[in-house]
Amino acid sequence: MPHNRRNYNKTHSIALSGLLFALAMALSFIEGTLVIPGLLPGMKLGLANIVVMYALFFMGPKQALVLDVLKAFFVFLVSGWTAGFLSLCGGLLSLLVMWLLYYHCPLRPTWFILSVCGALAHNIGQLLGASVILSTAVSLYYAPIMLVLGLVMGM
């Protein structure tokens, strides 16, 4: 019986990972088609990142990392190299910050705090990625706006 239970858990995990990836792709695609007045060019709500956060909490860091990398690859296929790279940079830093806070902080922060910190880290990761692409720190002038909007989007 334990062998069958292990196979069930593995099958369940693979199926759930596939469903979460499909949901992340759908949300990413929908988010790319939305036109929200007042948002700066390239600014999105981060709906697909909610799926990665869910995976981190309920499936663990390994599955969340795989989902985050697959999501960035999807963005690369749909929107190009630059968008995929920025998605990867933001996603990895966001995941790292949420992982550190959730698994290594003695006082468990609330989901709200984790979401806000993850959104801020995502924007910082994207700004750092843009600095690498542009080979200059000029993109950091965008930081105050990105951080304020990241704070709002994380809520």
PLM regions with names:
Residues 28-45, 69-98, 111, 133-138, ...:
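Interfacial aromatic-anchored transmembrane helix boundaries in multi-pass membrane proteins
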Residues 41, 84-88, 104-155:
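Membrane-embedded alpha-helical hairpins and interfacial helices in multi-pass inner-membrane proteins
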Residues 35, 52, 67, 126-130:
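Alpha-helical transmembrane segments and their lipid-water interface positions
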Residues 2-55:
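Hydrophobic transmembrane alpha-helices
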Residues 9-20, 45, 49, 64, ...:
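Residue-level signature of transmembrane alpha-helical entry/exit and packing/kink sites
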Residues 45-61, 97-102:
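Generic transmembrane alpha-helix motif of multi-pass integral membrane proteins
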Residues 50-53, 72, 76, 95, ...:
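Hydrophobic transmembrane alpha-helices of multi-pass small-molecule transporters
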